[in-house]
């Protein structure tokens, strides 16, 4: 039965794909061109480990770059190895896996200023603290915009720089300002017992590097490491993989069974610290690396591949590969250079009408129009409306980005961590309790005087001497609500608590 399953896993794969699936020991670099079946290869490789090599599923780690990719990988593996075996594997994004590690190793976070109940702040929460830091430093928000400060701080973290290191390496004055904001921002994070997404990576790397025994536990657990979209790894992510697979410079205890799948030609996250050099340096950092090139494209015709190859060949830092396809030459690529965006929109609408009239397409849903920025949709939409072409713009706010969901999560986070000032400020007047900015400012001042969190200051608000009667009553009502909810945590189910 085992041999039958093994044969099934290799059926339908081309020769390079088979090599990628069956090369299971030691470091492996799979260079996968677009449309070359890399997702199928990585899932079949994991299944091959379980079914043919008889590796326990819980020893397998698979890292993806999006939650969607993680879900799809798990669904595929459920079909290949079974639901129970798939559940035993660790599959997720770098951030999700690091968050899990930090929860397990929470006792080790105390020296870093965090308790077990730490919360994770999203980009909106980060922006709130960035603004607080800027105002606390009396910096002009119009000149040094919070969004710019946030991006510079995130980039510094992706380069594994602390505030002092960022200040030392600053080339422009705006970077010096950002380093000052960074220092206060980190202090505010810790006072809220919170971490941001970048901290998840940095803190995990720091714990593993400083505690060899902790690192060794994870090396023994995850003996087979897989990384998808490897070209998009930033420095902390790369270091995490090297620690797991190789170890520290003075302790090489990793088994080296690291399989990375990527394509330096497809790197899209350079703004987030990703570097194509990761692909180039992998062979240096992991001795005796085996390289497999997936060069057969199953998605496009040769004309499209040749055009793409002509463009990407100009990149100097890349692994050389030549994609080919069995789908034939295909139609030539048509290029239209418009004078402006209005002309571009007019041409696009006219071309859709032409394709429909000629019968090249059966229905409008066969057409997709892609653009680089949201601002470009205006000219297209105007032309579609004028020419009576029905259309649908894809893309709306994600579930967890909706205001009502973020508000509900803020309530839950505050209940779990009363030191979370950011969450308290978000929901103190949601729904409307007639607690305005002036009252909130009074509460913040009261908390500073008490040298405590906003939640603790709220519990003592009755002792405030200058606060108006209506404002004090509104704050006391909110305080009582939170106390009641905290008291009900142990007794109620989550759904009942939300009701």
Regions flagged by a language model, labelled:
Residues 26, 55-59, 86-88, 126, ...:
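Short glycine-/polar-rich loops that comprise or flank the Walker A/P-loop
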Residues 11-22, 26-30, 41-42, 54, ...:
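Conserved helicase NTPase motor core
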Residues 171, 224, 363, 377-389, ...:
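Conserved helicase C-terminal RecA-like lobe
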């Amino acid at each position: 039965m085992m041999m039958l399953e093994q044969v099934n896993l290799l059926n339908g794969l081309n020769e390079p794909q088979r090599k990628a699936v069956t090369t299971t020991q030691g470091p492996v670099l799979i260079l996968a061109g677009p449309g070359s079946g890399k997702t199928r290869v990585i899932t079949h490789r994991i299944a091959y480990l379980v079914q043919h090599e008889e590796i326990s599923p819980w020893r397998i780690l698979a890292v993806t770059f999006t939650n969607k990719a993680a879900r799809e990988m798990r669904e595929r593996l459920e079909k290949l190895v079974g639901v129970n075996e798939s559940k035993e594997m660790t599959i997720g994004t770098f951030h999700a896996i690091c968050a899990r590690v930090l929860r397990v190793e929470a006792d080790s976070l105390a020296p870093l200023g965090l308790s077990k109940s730490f919360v994770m702040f999203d980009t909106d929460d980060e922006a709130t603290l960035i603004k607080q830091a800027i105002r606390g430093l009396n910096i002009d928000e119009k000149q040094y915009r919070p969004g710019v400060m946030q991006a510079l701080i995130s980039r510094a973290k992706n380069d594994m720089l602390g505030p002092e290191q960022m200040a030392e390496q600053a080339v422009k004055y705006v970077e010096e300002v950002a380093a000052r904001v960074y220092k206060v921002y980190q202090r505010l994070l810790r006072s809220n017992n919170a971490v941001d997404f970048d901290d998840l990576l940095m803190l995990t790397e720091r714990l593993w590097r400083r505690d060899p025994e902790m690192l060794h536990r994870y090396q023994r657990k995850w003996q087979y490491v897989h990384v998808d979209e490897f070209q998009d790894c930033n420095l902390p992510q790369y270091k995490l993989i090297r620690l797991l697979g190789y170890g520290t410079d003075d302790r090489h205890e990793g088994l080296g069974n690291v399989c990375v799948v990527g394509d330096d030609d497809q790197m899209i996250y350079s703004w987030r610290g990703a570097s194509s050099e990761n692909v180039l340096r992998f062979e240096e950092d992991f001795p005796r690396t085996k390289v497999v090139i997936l060069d057969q494209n199953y998605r496009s015709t040769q004309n499209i591949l040749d055009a793409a190859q002509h463009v990407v060949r100009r990149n100097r830092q890349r692994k050389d590969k030549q994609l080919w396809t069995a789908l034939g030459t295909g139609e030539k690529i048509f290029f239209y250079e418009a004078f402006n965006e209005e002309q571009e929109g007019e041409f696009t609408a006219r071309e859709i009408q032409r394709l429909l009239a000629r019968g090249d397409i059966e229905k409008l849903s066969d057409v997709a129009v892609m653009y680089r920025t949201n601002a470009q949709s205006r000219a297209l939409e105007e032309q579609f409306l004028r020419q009576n072409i029905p259309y649908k713009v894809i893309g709306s706010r994600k579930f967890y980005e909706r205001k009502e969901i973020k508000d509900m999560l803020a309530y839950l986070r505050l209940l779990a961590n009363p030191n979370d000032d950011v969450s308290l400020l978000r929901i103190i007047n949601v729904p409307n309790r007639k607690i305005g900015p002036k009252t909130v400012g009074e509460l913040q001042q009261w908390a500073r005087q008490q040298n405590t969190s906003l939640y603790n200051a709220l519990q003592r608000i009755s002792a405030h001497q200058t606060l108006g009667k209506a404002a004090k009553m509104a704050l006391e009502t909110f305080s009582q609500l939170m106390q009641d909810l905290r008291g009900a945590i142990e007794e109620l189910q989550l759904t009942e608590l939300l009701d």
